[in-house]
From Swiss-Prot:
GO biological process, one term: silent mating-type cassette heterochromatin formation
Protein name per its UniProtKB record: Histone H2A.Z
GO CC terms: euchromatin; nucleosome; nucleus
UniProt entry tagged with the keyword Ribosomal protein: no
PANTHER family linked: HISTONE H2A
Family annotation (InterPro entries): Histone-fold, Histone_H2A, Histone_H2A/H2B/H3, Histone_H2A_C
Record gene name: htz1
Post-translational modification: Acetylated once deposited into chromatin.
Purpose of the protein: Variant histone H2A which can replace H2A in some nucleosomes. Nucleosomes wrap and compact DNA into chromatin, limiting DNA accessibility to the cellular machineries which require DNA as a template. Histones thereby play a central role in transcription regulation, DNA repair, DNA replication and chromosomal stability. DNA accessibility is regulated via a complex set of post-translational modifications of histones, also called histone code, and nucleosome remodeling.
SMART domains, per database record: H2A
């Protein structure tokens, strides 16, 4: 019955091939670990006038967040490995972020318990070297 009432040929209820497939999240489709749905919800709730947010926008923002997180964690892990410890602390995050020029310009926040970067003024170093030469 193509034009009248009754059973239709297409549709979700009767198809067997869709019943065997598991649902895939937006994150799984995009190959991401961070949740696209949660990021989209945050974007919708935090925009003024409850503006509409596209699905691709949420995927792009999620991908950027995941990339930046992976970059910071990799550098902080290297800093922790250099100091021969197995746990990443705020100090390692501080050393990683301030050691990378691009991340330093991007993240201008103060990291709690991060400490300061080790740096000795050049004028002080020159005085110490001159004293060693005079003593020798």
């Amino acid at each position: 019955m193509p034009g009248g009432k009754g059973k239709s040929i297409g549709g979700k209820a009767g198809s067997k091939d869709s019943a065997g497939k598991a649902q895939k999240s937006h994150s799984a489709k995009a190959g991401l670990q961070f949740p696209c749905g949660r990021v989209k919800r945050f974007l919708k709730n935090n925009t003024q006038n409850k503006m509409r947010v596209g699905a691709k926008a949420a995927v792009y923002v999620t991908a950027v967040l995941e990339y930046l997180t992976a970059e910071v964690l990799e550098l902080a892990g290297n800093a922790a490995k250099d100091l021969k410890v197995k746990r990443i602390t705020p100090r390692h995050l501080q050393l990683a972020i301030r050691g990378d020029e691009e991340l330093d310009t991007l993240i201008r926040a103060t990291i709690a318990f991060g400490g300061v970067l080790p740096r000795i003024n050049r004028a002080l170093l020159l005085k110490v070297e001159q004293k060693k030469k005079k003593d020798a």
